A protein has these predicted regions:
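Polar, S/T/G-rich
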Residues: 1-258, 353-388, 392-411, 431-438, ...
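Short beta-strand-centered aromatic/proline hotspots
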Residues: 86-95, 657-667
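Terminal (often C-terminal
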Residues: 241-303, 307, 348-378
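A glycine-anchored, Pro-Gly-centered beta-turn/N-cap motif
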Residues: 280-287, 320, 332-334, 657
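Solvent-exposed serine/threonine-rich low-complexity stretches and specific carbohydrate-binding patches
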Residues: 311-320
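Exposed aromatic-hydrophobic patches
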Residues: 322-329
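Short beta-strand-plus-loop segments that form exposed binding edges in beta-rich domains
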Residues: 339-346
Length: 681
């Protein structure tokens, strides 16, 4: 019998002597392949003792000021025999009363990875600080980012409306990329293109914003399969900005410095001021705030204020000093940025865009509060202009951060756990299992009175697909081939009639079919490949966020024509082409982001065999569909050494056979465990 100890917010709580606390552990479950799991306990009860009542602040009493906030999980740790076992969080489920007095509290323990979802919340990608990539949207910059050799931020050859082609014998300005002369009308107009950002930069920004660290097992610059992927910065269909807005362009106020005495309660990141939910949530409160704008002239200007990248306030056509206060909008938690626009040049000197906010910190046992007051001022001069500024938080696709990460995890079959150093270890599932060589023999601990051997195959078929298959060529492919572009329906080349369900792994991104251009005069292949982001009516398309590989074409390439105006263009012999494969030659790499083997758009061949299914899912899924695979259920009384040492990628040895752990449920006081094991075939 182990001694169970539970600490909540560093306070050891009292436990019932006979309370049973069981923890469930699984990281990849054969019944729900696309999900990543975390440890959790069954809901259990602890007594309403003096210590526990103080911790939960007599939660049953509605009238108590500064009560326990059950909307939030609290940090917790489970110890066994005074030795740390699991760190995580507890959630208060409720209070049981007897004779109108508190008798017990119902709580649930969750492993540390559950905190990731809580941290990210409903934040969208626009809440991330990617302001270092903000850039004017102009012919010069579009051209420069098409030719740049450093690929963190590029212009790929993807058009939002115009269809492109190549004809060395033609000289008509309707999308012909052939460069005839500097005064011809051939070429792609620069504003038909948009920028793209490397996915790695987004993941780096996630780590910075939420103060988390991912391991470099997968998210690493040396992993080209990951590092060469990009996100197209496409937030609205068609043009980046409608033509009627071109006369007024907005400039972001770049950076704030603390004017009030330190330490600050709020904080800054990039070009924004962060207001934590801690300070907007009861018992803490925001008392007031003021944005102040002091221009050097009396010219007309417009103010826009953003929270997490979404505009929440606008004051149009104002002059002179302006104040924006709590009478204009409510200050909720988030990152606040400011942009100023004008049809003329308006200057705001350093320090003349200001954000002052004050509030109270409550929550002490005696109900006392502490007042705080922060003032932030712009750290550089802001000057409006007539060139449109491409701000990443306004142009990045509308998508929650958690959905973005979940999409990547499903795409590459990644799994995650938190190590002793607090790092979130992210690995492909195959690598996770390969990382452990430890086998635990449990023969002597197994209850031989009862066990079962069940069918391990819960599905007749597993479908892998992208949710976004709405562009013209992807739709056309589906109509002609009767399958989704890049989609696979896996059933191990057999039709099973015992299981009846189909499991779907669906990725929340758009998946384009690209076009390699052929010279209409003579029929020779060019080095040009482009993406046409339109719907099946050949009209501008919104779609889902687009992920693609970018490949630099710079030697022995076909020059293309980039148009500045209708009668002015420039020849470009280096440019970034989009691709579903990491390379344009399978001798360099066969990696691609299809699930099924498809004809490569650039080569026309089928040698790019490194699909997502082949590289990330095949080993696990083929094992699931193997006729020899069984799901064995046993009960065992595990000793404390195994309970402490067991990792979910370890093997279990039972009766001279090795097994993978599908799930394990353990009573932490008795060691009684129920194990689901998958035999290794």
């Amino acid at each position: 019998m182990q001694k169970l100890q539970l600490f909540i917010s560093n306070t050891r709580v009292d436990l019932f002597k006979d309370e049973s606390v069981s923890i469930n552990q699984t990281i990849q479950n054969v019944r729900d392949i696309a999900k990543i799991f975390t440890e959790f306990t069954q809901t259990f009860t602890i007594p309403a003792s003096k210590t526990n009542n103080k911790l939960f602040k007599h939660y049953h009493n509605y009238d108590i000021v500064n009560t326990f906030d059950a909307r939030r999980k609290e940090a917790a740790e489970i110890q066994l025999n005074n030795v740390p076992f699991k760190k995580g969080f507890i959630r208060l489920e409720g209070v049981q009363l007897k004779k109108n007095k508190p008798y017990s509290y119902k709580i649930t323990f969750f492993g540390e990875t559950v905190n990731l979802k809580d941290l990210l919340g409903d934040d969208e990608l626009s809440a991330l600080d990617l302001s270092s990539f903000d850039i004017d949207y102009s012919f010069g910059n579009i051209k420069n980012k098409m030719q740049t050799s450093t690929g963190g931020f590029i212009t790929p050859l993807i058009t939002h409306t115009r269809q492109l082609y190549f004809d060395s014998g033609g000289n008509v300005g309707n999308g012909n990329l052939h460069y005839a002369s500097s005064s011809s009308s051939n070429g792609v107009f620069w504003s038909d293109l948009k920028y793209a950002i490397r996915l790695h930069e987004i993941v780096q920004a996630i780590q910075t914003k939420y103060s988390i660290t991912f391991s470099n097992d997968f998210f690493d610059s040396s992993n080209a399969t990951w590092y060469n992927l990009y996100l197209w910065l496409h937030r609205k269909k068609g043009d980046v900005e409608p033509a009627q807005q071109v006369s007024m362009q907005f400039k972001t106020v770049t950076g704030f410095g603390l004017e009030s005495d330190p330490p600050a309660t709020t904080s800054v990141s990039g070009n924004g001021v962060n207001v934590s939910s801690t300070y907007t949530t009861y018992p803490n409160t925001i008392l007031g705030f003021t944005f102040t704008f002091i221009p050097t002239t009396t010219d007309v200007y417009t103010i826009r204020i953003f929270r997490n990248g979404s505009q929440i306030f606008q004051a149009e056509d104002v002059t002179g000093t302006q104040l924006v206060t709590q009478s204009d909008f409510t200050l909720a938690s988030g990152t606040y940025t400011v942009a100023i626009g004008s049809t003329s040049t308006v200057t705001f000197n350093s320090g003349n865009v200001r954000f002052a906010v004050n509030g109270n910190l409550g929550g002490t046992d005696d109900g006392s509060v502490t007042a705080w007051n922060d003032e932030w001022r712009s750290s550089s001069q802001t000057v409006t202009g007539t060139t449109f500024e491409f701000r990443i938080n306004e142009q990045i696709p509308k998508m929650k951060v958690i959905d973005f990460l979940t999409g990547l995890f499903r795409m590459f079959n990644l799994t995650a756990f938190i190590n002793d150093a607090g790092t979130i270890v992210v690995q492909k599932l195959d690598d996770f299992y390969a990382a452990s060589s430890i086998t635990h023999n449990i023969d002597e601990y197994v209850d031989i009175k009862s066990s079962s051997v069940d069918v391990a195959l819960p599905f007749k078929e597993i479908d892998f697909a992208y949710k976004g298959l709405g562009t013209f060529l992807s739709k056309q492919f589906e109509q002609l081939e009767n399958k989704g572009w890049g989609t696979i329906e896996y059933s191990a080349d057999s039709t099973f009639d015992a299981p009846s369900d189909t499991y779907k792994v669906e990725i929340p991104f758009e998946h384009l079919q690209y076009q390699r251009l052929v010279n209409a005069t003579g029929g020779a292949n060019t080095s040009i490949q482009f993406g046409w982001f339109v719907d099946d009516n050949k009209e501008s398309f919104y779609g889902l966020p687009l992920i693609f590989y970018a490949i630099k074409q710079s030697s022995s390439t076909t020059a293309i024509s980039l148009k500045n105006t209708e009668t002015s263009n420039q020849s470009m012999s280096s440019y970034w082409i989009p691709s579903n494969s990491r390379a344009i030659s399978s001798s360099t790499s066969t990696d691609n982001i299809h699930f099924d083997l498809e004809v490569n758009e650039y080569t026309g061949g089928s040698t790019f065999t490194g699909t997502l299914f082949e590289n990330c899912y095949k080993t696990y899924i083929q094992d699931v569909f193997n006729a020899g695979r069984r799901l064995t259920k046993v009960k065992a009384k595990l000793p404390l050494k195994i309970i402490f040492d067991l990792k979910l990628n370890d093997k279990i040895s039972l009766h001279n056979r090795n097994y993978r752990i599908n799930s394990i449920k353990t009573n932490l006081t008795t060691g009684d465990s129920s194990l689901e094991l998958l035999n290794i075939v």
